[in-house]
């Protein structure tokens, strides 16, 4: 019976490392080693799959794409992340937003206010890198609105 307590502890802790952190470990390793495009590839499926952590995956992938100088692709993910972040009632998404197809499970992570600001800041930077100064100004104004 001396083995029972450690077994119970091990089983209870095994669930702690799962989910988002475990799923992104490979992508994080690629990102930190400067392989931004590879990190983005590893995050693509999760970023575009409906689920409770989709916003997190989108933010990670969009940031990796930005670092890889893939500004158009980065903007697509940041714009989708922005739409998801703006949804206030996660229990009736299909009724509120017909253009964005997501499941009701997505409500688990809504994002923090600073992340909403970062989305607009990255969009502004991407637009500047693409030579779209008017769009960058729009996103800069959105930063002020979000603050």
Predicted regions and their residues:
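Bacterial Sec signal peptide processing site at the extreme N-terminus
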Residues: 13-38, 45-49
């Amino acid at each position: 019976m001396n083995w029972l307590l450690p077994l119970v502890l091990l089983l209870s802790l095994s669930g702690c490392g799962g989910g988002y952190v475990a799923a992104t470990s490979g992508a994080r390793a690629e990102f930190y080693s400067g392989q931004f495009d590879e990190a983005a590839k590893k995050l693509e499926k999760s970023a575009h799959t409906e689920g409770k952590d989709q916003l997190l995956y989108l933010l990670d992938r969009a940031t990796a794409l930005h670092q890889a100088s893939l500004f158009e692709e980065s903007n697509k993910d940041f714009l989708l992340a922005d739409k998801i972040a703006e949804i206030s009632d996660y229990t009736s998404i299909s009724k509120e937003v017909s253009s964005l197809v997501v499941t009701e499970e997505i409500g688990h992570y809504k994002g923090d206010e600073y992340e909403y600001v970062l989305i607009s800041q990255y969009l502004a930077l991407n637009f500047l890198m693409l030579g779209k100064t008017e769009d960058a100004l729009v996103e800069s104004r959105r930063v002020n609105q979000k603050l």
